[in-house]
Amino acid sequence: MYEIRKIHSNEVMEALALALEVFLQFEAPDYKPEGIETFKRDIVENDEFISKCQQGICPYAAFDKGKMIGIIGMYSNRKHINLAFTKKEYHRQGVATSIFQYLLADILKDAPKLHEITLNSSPYGKPFYLHIGFKPQSDEQEIDGIRFTPMKYTI
């Protein structure tokens, strides 16, 4: 079993490094160079995003023996997932599903009337999101080189 919790402010850069590592392995091959640069600029190198994380609007993460192995982040409104990555060697072992279940329970403690969570799924992540109950809301789109399908999870 993995430890699942919100990351601490001193773990933000580790989480972003994990996101970039997994993005480059699994997402980048399907993206134009513009999309790769957009991801880096908007997430990994975004000082505002990093600052918010360090102030407590942090991703949730799974740890195996103290090592961060997966993350799921949300915007501060806690209604939209903005990143989800699991290290390659932990794919298909329930890591991301466990993080999602934990964050959903955590959110519902504070917002019991929340009725949906949204995200923009990458092509690589779409089968996972379908598996845990997200439904596509439109066809795949591309903005600034980032390919995504808007999806919604109804609670």
Name each model-derived stretch:
Residues I107-S121:
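Conserved GNAT acetyl-CoA-binding A-motif
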